[in-house]
Design a protein with these regions (language model features):
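Alpha-amylase-like alpha-glycosidases and glucanotransferases acting on alpha-linked glucans and related
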Residues: 184-232
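Active-site and substrate-binding clefts of carbohydrate-active enzymes
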Residues: 32-63, 70-72, 191-194, 202-203, ...
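CE4/NodB-like, metal-dependent polysaccharide N-deacetylase domain
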Residues: 126-155, 199, 230-246
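N-terminal export leaders
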Residues: 5-9, 13
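Catalytic domains of cell-wall/extracellular-matrix polysaccharide-remodeling enzymes
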Residues: 134-190, 248-268
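Short, well-structured secondary-structure segments
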Residues: 34-125, 131-135, 149-153, 172-178, ...
Length: 314
C-alpha cells in the first residue's frame, strides 16, 4: 500500500512537472486579436435624374457590386438605397435587385433606412421626418420581410432634434462621421464601437465612420487595406467602421476598371475572409452583441469636407 502511494505521488508529480511548462507556454501564446469590419455602402441619385445617367450608374457600379458580393455569402455588409432610386432599379432591373433581396433574407446584407427621397432630416419638420422615414421603412419591410433598425443620414448632417423621429419609426442607430466625435474631444482610438445619445430622454445609438477607411477604400491596394485592418486588430481595436458612397466603386474616375476589371473588390473580399484577424458583420449583429461605449452629445455638424464646402466664399 505504501509503495502504491509512492508510485501515485511520483506519477502526480511527474504529471504536474510535465504539464507546468505546457501551461506556461499556453499562457505565453497570445490569443489572436480580431477586428470586426462593419462595411456599408450608400446609393442615391437625385430625384428626377436623367434615366441614362442612372442606367450608367447601374451598369458600372450597382450591378457589378451586387453580383460580386452575392458570390461571397460569408462576407456581411450593409447597404442603403434611397427610396426613389430603389423603386427605379426594381422596376427596370428586377433580377439584379432580387439578388439584393436574397442577400438580405439570408442574413448577408442589412438594409438601412432613411428619408424616402433623401431629405436632410434636420432641415424638415418633425411630421415630415416621420413620414419620410416610415415610407422607406414600410417599403423595405414589404420587399424583404426585414424591418430596418439602422438609418443613413443624408450628407451625415447631425442635429439632435432628429432623434425623436428616428426612434419613433423604429430606428435604433445611425452612422455619422468620426469628425462629429472629434468635435466633442473623443480620440480616434476610442471610436471602434457605438455610442449612445438622447433627446428629451429618447435614446439613439451612433456609429462613428472612419475617415481613414473612407480615404483607403477603394483607392489603396487591397493588400494594403487588409494590412491596415490587421494592424488595427493587433492594437486591440474592436471594430473598423465604414459607410460611404457606393458610387466610389465604379462611377468615380478610373474606379470601374480598378474595382472590377483589375479585381480590387474580389481581392479585398477574399483577403478579408482569409484573414484570421478580420471578421465581417452587419451593424445589427454588432449592435446586438456589443455594449455602448457611453453617452455622447454631438454638436450640429456634418462631415469635415461638407463643413468646408458650406463656408462662404472669400
Amino acid at each position: 500500500m505504501r509503495e502504491q502511494r509512492r508510485c501515485l505521488l511520483a506519477s502526480t508529480c511527474l504529471s504536474s512537472a510535465f504539464l507546468r511548462p505546457l501551461r506556461a507556454a499556453a499562457l505565453k501564446t497570445p490569443m489572436t486579436q480580431t477586428i470586426t469590419l462593419l462595411l456599408g455602402v450608400h446609393a442615391h441619385q437625385p430625384v428626377g435624374n436623367f434615366p441614362e445617367v442612372i442606367e450608367d450608374a447601374h451598369q458600372r457600379c450597382y450591378k457589378p457590386f451586387l453580383h460580386t458580393l452575392h458570390a461571397y455569402p460569408d462576407f456581411r455588409f450593409a447597404a442603403h438605397f434611397s427610396g426613389w432610386l430603389l423603386d427605379w432599379l426594381r422596376e427596370r432591373h428586377p433580377a439584379d435587385m432580387a439578388l439584393l433581396a436574397e442577400m438580405v433574407r439570408r442574413g448577408q446584407v442589412e438594409l438601412f433606412s432613411s428619408g424616402d427621397t433623401e431629405p436632410v432630416l434636420a432641415a424638415i419638420p418633425h411630421r415630415d421626418r416621420i413620414g419620410q422615414l416610415q415610407t422607406l421603412n414600410d417599403k423595405l419591410t414589404a420587399w424583404t420581410g426585414v424591418q430596418p433598425s439602422g438609418a443613413w443620414l443624408t450628407e451625415r448632417v447631425w442635429e439632435s432634434a432628429v432623434v425623436p423621429a428616428l426612434a419613433a419609426t423604429g430606428i435604433r442607430y445611425v452612422t455619422v462621421d468620426d469628425y462629429h466625435f472629434f468635435c466633442t474631444g473623443q480620440p480616434a482610438t476610442a471610436l471602434d464601437g457605438y455610442f449612445s445619445t438622447e433627446e428629451d430622454g429618447t435614446r439613439l445609438d451612433l456609429f462613428p465612420i472612419s475617415e481613414a477607411l473612407r480615404y483607403r477604400l477603394p483607392f489603396s491596394p487591397a493588400h494594403e487595406v487588409i494590412a491596415y485592418l490587421e494592424g488595427l486588430a493587433e492594437q486591440g481595436q474592436v471594430a473598423a467602421i465604414y459607410f460611404d458612397d457606393i458610387e466610389k466603386f465604379g462611377i468615380w474616375p478610373e474606379t470601374y476598371d480598378w474595382v472590377y476589371h483589375r479585381g480590387w473588390l474580389k481581392a479585398l473580399i477574399e483577403g478579408v475572409l482569409a484573414s484570421p484577424k478580420i471578421r465581417t458583420a452587419t451593424y445589427a449583429d454588432f449592435h446586438a452583441g456589443n455594449a455602448t461605449r457611453g453617452i455622447v452629445y454631438l454638436p450640429t455638424t456634418s462631415y469635415s469636407e461638407m463643413n468646408e464646402w458650406t463656408l462662404p466664399m472669400p
